[in-house]
């Protein structure tokens, strides 16, 4: 079984993802797991230290007001979806799990477009922007 897990930026997205991964590994030791995060978030350090395969997708969240920076970020988001589609195509996941953070959006979209079942884990009382 191949599983993509994506979430990042803060520990609030990363540690729930790691907990899910450990539960999967206990039940399905042969599962191949790929963690997709950003190159600048905490996950870029934490996930490889946990012994997990990690791929980074360069992406940043949008500002909550109109700005030229959002135009640039929209372009990065388009590129992130293209990169995510390549990751999904190359890894052939049986399922994709998102735990929040901007990086989960392109991964879950790419998985969904490829017909891969997706799950969103939301631990907050109010869902974040991506979830």
Regions found by a protein language model. Give the residues of each.
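Conserved nucleotide-sugar phosphate-binding/catalytic loop shared by glycosyltransferases and other
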Residues: 2-10, 30-83
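Structural detector of well-ordered beta-strand residues that form the stable sheet scaffold
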Residues: 4, 34, 96-97, 119
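Residue-level detector of alpha-helix initiation sites
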Residues: 10-11, 101-103, 125-129
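Short amphipathic alpha-helix
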Residues: 13-25
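Short helix-capping segments at alpha-helix termini
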Residues: 25-30, 113-115
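Glycosyltransferases and closely related glycan-assembly transferases
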Residues: 83-96, 105-119
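Active-site-proximal region of nucleotide-activated glycan assembly enzymes
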Residues: 113-131
């Amino acid at each position: 079984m191949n599983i993509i897990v994506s979430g990042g930026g803060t520990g609030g997205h990363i540690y729930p993802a790691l907990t899910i991964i450990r539960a999967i590994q206990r039940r399905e030791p042969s599962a191949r797991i790929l963690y997709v995060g950003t190159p600048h978030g905490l996950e870029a350090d934490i996930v490889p230290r946990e012994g997990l395969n990690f791929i980074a997708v360069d992406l940043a969240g949008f500002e909550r007001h109109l700005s030229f920076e959002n135009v640039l970020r929209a372009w990065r988001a388009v590129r992130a979806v293209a990169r995510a589609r390549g990751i999904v195509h190359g890894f052939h996941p049986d399922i994709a799990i998102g735990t929040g953070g901007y990086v989960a959006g392109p991964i879950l979209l790419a998985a969904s477009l490829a017909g891969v079942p997706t799950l969103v884990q939301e631990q907050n009382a109010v869902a974040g922007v991506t979830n």
